[in-house]
Amino acid sequence: EYVGVDACAVNLMRPAMYGAYHHITVMGREDEPCTRMYDVVGSLCENNDKFAIDRMLPEIKKGDLLFIHDAGAHGFAMGYNYNGKLKSAELLLKEDGTVEMIRRAETPEDYFATFDFCDILRNID
């Protein structure tokens, strides 16, 4: 079975690039038994955009949030804007269980900020 997620190799390239393992949990159901086998796949149109292959997880339903652990510095540092995908925000899970946003998500304005190839963009109303 496949589980498609909003994230993709743009956000975490290591599994797609060389099969790196990242533990995955289903938020709020961490203590449920892992009874289903899934390929967890990203949103790119590439056959290697996968976060996990044959991973045992609890049953996943539409709307569930998946936590991909130990992404750390690899997410942003190896990220890229393939297919026009914007980089996600980065969240830090602290030892006390609190979460802090340490980098905001990119916006379309960020994506086009370095373009300076002609006046066409400046003259759009």
Language model features with spans:
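Charged (often Lys/Glu-rich) extended helix/loop segments that serve as interaction or gating elements
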Residues: E1-D125
